[in-house]
């Protein structure tokens, strides 16, 4: 309480995820989300997110996966920022290479599954990918000419059917847009194989 008044804040988180079948062997999962805090008559730390993921299974052991993501932050708290790099989808650029209040990411990946239950321990696959994205500050307008693009390959290791753990991926990405003082090759490993 300050000067007899009460400062109140309302925290809001709302979203919807919808699967959309497009026919045999392919579908889209679309998501819209808003998170924010309303206080003193304005929205603070407000983040609007739109995502869509597409999967097309060409054959039993071959699939195409793509995604698009757009996020816009408004009056973000100092400790909150939108980051883009190898850790969240732009696989040819270092961790947290780009930051700002607006993020756009487009990815496409062709996957080939090579072997199932090798020694009853893991499954093996490979993928080729292209990622393109950027992050703009609140003062900048979204400009597709700013997009940074990377291409690369991935080794996909899936756990066996008895394990509750997900798979592991090892990515080798090459940034097509040269950045001052930054190498163009990025090697990364992680547990995000989901489509």
Give each language-model segment a name.
Residues 2-195:
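C-terminal transmembrane beta-barrel domains of outer membrane proteins
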């Amino acid at each position: 309480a300050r000067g007899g008044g009460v400062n109140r804040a309302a925290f809001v988180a709302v979203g919807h995820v919808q699967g959309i079948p497009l026919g045999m062997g392919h579908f889209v999962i679309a998501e819209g989300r808003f998170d924010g805090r309303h206080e003193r008559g304005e929205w603070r730390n407000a983040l609007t997110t739109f995502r869509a993921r597409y999967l097309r299974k060409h054959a039993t052991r071959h699939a195409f996966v793509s995604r698009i993501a757009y996020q816009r932050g408004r009056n973000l708290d100092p400790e909150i920022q939108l980051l883009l790099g190898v850790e969240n989808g732009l696989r040819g650029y270092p961790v947290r290479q780009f930051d700002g209040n607006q993020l756009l990411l487009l990815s496409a990946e062709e996957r080939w599954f090579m072997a199932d239950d090798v020694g009853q321990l893991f499954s093996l696959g490979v993928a080729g990918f292209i990622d393109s994205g950027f992050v703009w500050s609140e003062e900048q307008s979204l400009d597709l000419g700013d997009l940074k693009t990377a291409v690369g390959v991935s080794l996909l290791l899936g756990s066996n059917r008895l394990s509750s753990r997900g798979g592991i991926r090892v990515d080798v990405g090459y940034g097509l847009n040269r950045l001052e003082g930054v190498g163009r090759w990025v090697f990364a490993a992680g547990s995000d194989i989901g489509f």
